């Protein structure tokens, strides 16, 4: 686990993918039957200038088509990006 308090089983059952890559999209498509949810920071705290709108829109298309929950971690962005959060903006 990357942080204290994160159970080892969470880390064992998570797939960590590179942000903004075609490979990440392919993995989600190809392993959709194994994936319950995609958790993503729409604007990464470590790299706030990387905002690949098309990537996020494609993840939404894939998750909707495959009936996978898409969860946007907006602890950093919250309502700062738009009244509906970054998910409204993307």
Ranges and model annotations:
Residues 17, 40, 72-73:
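Active-site flanking residues adjacent to catalytic metal/cofactor-binding acidic residues
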Residues 20, 29, 37-40, 56-66:
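Metal-dependent enolase-superfamily TIM-barrel catalytic cores that perform enediolate-based chemistry
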Residues 21, 44, 76-77:
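Short, glycine/acidic-enriched loop or turn micro-motifs at the edges of active sites
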Residues 32-49:
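Short acidic, glycine-rich surface-loop motifs adjacent to enzyme active sites
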Residues 49-83:
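Catalytic PLP-binding core of fold-type I/II PLP enzymes
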Residues 87-90:
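Conserved active-site segment immediately N-terminal to the catalytic lysine
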